[in-house]
């Protein structure tokens, strides 16, 4: 991502003048559609067709070149064939145009010559400083200004454009506009839409960074196929967090097939999905699984309301719908609690005796003949101190919809708590009226519950990590270990060096001594005392247990001497006659974790935690965080593991020392951050947890170095 030039991005978002290079007089052609759309919807700025063969385009004066235009040009849309795009963008930069949109395909997404062409485009961008959206994109639209430099068909339905507080960025052009159209149909108003295409210059992260600063944007939505600039995206997330503007994101490529398709479609590298998932959760980005969830969340976030808690009160015409809502709400992390008796008595005064004043409140079908009941019930619900969110479940009832909607609107305007309506069946007219009033409306209780669950997660999100580097790190030891390994031309540290490295960062390690031969191993065991482990210590063999290179719980001189000799024989057979031995004190603790660090191509150094030992791949229970982390964020990673109940008291076993484990995770995250240029991967496996107060100990560690630059 280039250096942020917010002025250029703002002129892209709010262009007062737009030049169309290669503008066609034919409004049906792709190169003619931008002018037709902006004329139809009333663009308020200057529209400047560039066509060397015509004096007029679609009734507008045409210009032979950019140089023939007087005054500033905020934005150019380059509607030229791919082989003419580079010259066109260069002309724009020469003319002083700050931003351009490139619609043509045939660049990096097709490989070969297209990649070379995209590199030429990037060279021009680097030389001139012009900002470019695309190539291989269908443009953008700003509904506030009716600026529509796009050739989309999303506006061909003849309807009005619904402007609103949501701005949407999509790496996919066509599918992005499908989502835009669905949002409009669902009553979700959009302020800006931008398609980033191949991201030769402007990335999703940078576009979101520009949008988050606009007053008209209260909610950001993103459809992602890959993330090139993960750290920049997280910087935007931090800014959005400060402004209380949610980022709602759908990222495809969870499966290998999806990742391959995403890469071939937009020439983007789909990073490891688990890293994206952990990074976005850590920074408050709301990740959603598809278009339906994205739009549903958009509806409940768009009015800017937040919830103080997870307690949902439901009023339902149907008892069955209320039960379904309660189930779905619970599945999405919400609480549906019966009201206390005093409040139930108040509700019982306004509903039939055969209804239920508990929560969910069953208003019964009497509501159809007495729609005023809903107003009275909602007044009580709004006053109820144990209600954080409100859901009203209705269905059919077209003839009674007027007073019902009036009651809902009155309640909605009288409270700042989130209030949603589920209106199932009927003609759809009640839902459209609610949409026009700005009240979130759904057809399915489950979808409403899922959206409210996401709203609660965001509203109650923890603070972003504010990690402070520990002041007891021994940087001199760290530099010495790395210097020695580099001078020897090695690609990994052996276990002893790796353990010394993490110990320099304050990670407790099991006592150990290296030994050159069986006699030295016996002497080391005597010094350590108690049962010991004897392991191969090799600069070349990484996973010792795979070749039988570990002996555990050894006592007695002869037992240790025999085991040591056998291990050296194994090393010779494995091709490392220079291998040594590591004699290590057996450690306490019976809960095994793995804590690893790695460098992600998009997000940089990350930390991976999970339940470990030799079954780490089988258990596949892990969480990812972006380094550096503080202790609180590290603890949240650990408690997010599926097996996190093992940290508590289980069948008489005392609780594990979770705080000590979190401290180790935080310290290793600083190692990942500090040594990102030196350490490609590092695994502590296992990290043994003892009971509360007895701490943790790292038993085995392996660090892989980055390849030296040529």
Feature-to-residue mapping (PLM):
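Catalytic-core regions of core metabolic enzymes
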Residues: 1-710
